[in-house]
Amino acid sequence: YNGTAPKQFPDGAFKELRAVFSVHPEPFTVVARADSGIKTFDDLKGKRVNVGDPGSGQRGTMEVVMEKMGWSMDDFALASELKSSEQSAALCDNKIDAMVFTVGHPNGSIKEATTSCDAIIVTVDNPVIKKLVDDNAYYAFASIPGGMYKGTDNDVTTFGVGATFVSSTKTDADTVYQIVKAVFDNIDRFKKMHPAFATLEPSRMIVNNLSAPLHDGAVKYYKEKGWMQ
């Protein structure tokens, strides 16, 4: 909607995009080998890093952060472009020092990396990140709970987006209304569909981490429920 990734979307902003509701947070997650010397995001410079495959969410976020940091791919000893399904094995095979992932937690791929070899979750928090979050409403600071993954006992600060269910102005209001009604009339069942959904609250799902205006069909339901004026 905002048109902030010209490489992925050369046609510019997609102003027909509409949010329906947000789901779970997807923190930008950096996992590093314990023997790599990487403790914070700044330590990635000069290391072997999987930046994600072109077009992926983690690659898009990584490129945004790199631009703000003033980094290029040449600042890494290796900038691999592995898919998210390939990077955990590469980390534990010592082919890379760190990997990035924009994902909800707990996540199976990260559990694989942290149980198959000695790996840690890395803090992503510096003045550049603070400004990035302050300047963009669709980003927010996030915390990955300590103890969720082997090797990381304390909470880890990072930032990220919220996974959002979206539609467009081309989808009629009644269709979106019926989808929203099905989800929220059965919210307890919906929350059991994935561990990352467990803490979802309708009051937050309709206002937090929405990167586009709400669809008219969603607004109709929320007003009927008294959740919006």
Language model features with spans:
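Pocket-lining segment of extracytoplasmic ligand-binding domains
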Residues: 73-166, 170-171
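Soluble non-cytosolic domains of exported or imported proteins
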Residues: 35, 53-60, 82-85, 100, ...
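Solvent-exposed coil/turn segments that connect beta secondary-structure elements
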Residues: 25, 33-36, 54, 104-105, ...
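Ligand-binding cleft/hinge of the Venus flytrap
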Residues: 8, 58-77, 95, 111-115, ...
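Extracytoplasmic/secreted envelope proteins and their assembly/folding machinery
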Residues: 17, 41, 59-63, 88, ...
